[in-house]
């Protein structure tokens, strides 16, 4: 799951222009892509991606289609400059994917899982369906999330076991209160603790558990005191 390869272009039916090198300028970065690299970025089943269109359209046609965020200026018969204004980090990952035919999605996800959505958005605009599919698979499924939540609940119950005796509360009530606390904060736990460590390892980080236990203990104590007062 950490890498995904292109299906190199097998059949080229559209007429190609004579451009051999495209100099892509995005914000403060410049990339130099060869014709073959761009041809290899073609999406299968004749659904051509943005970069493939650079070689099948003249500059006027290209600018008519993509003028809202891209502009192609021909230098000479072999070279052209392409000017973009898109998310820099996401575009850098996409260019690296085009140049190497690989992307380490798990590493990107582990460093900043929200960046995956930025890359997906940009890859969608650029018509890179394979890359979009690959990156979407990185997000945890509902089953994976529920399994992590289950581990968290079990770990919290074990970590806070002594509170059950401290407040002399019914074991079932103790368990229900912890489950309720985690369920109430499920979205927060997923966004801040589960997704950021999705590919770090198979265990729930001890530092994360400390935060969640603190959250649950505060809620548990408030619920038990509330029940005691009534």
Swiss-Prot record:
Note the superkingdom of the native organism. Viruses
Which lineage ranks, top first, belong to the organism behind this chain?
A: Viruses, Varidnaviria, Bamfordvirae, Nucleocytoviricota, Megaviricetes
Protein name (database record): Uncharacterized protein R317
Its source organism is Acanthamoeba polyphaga mimivirus
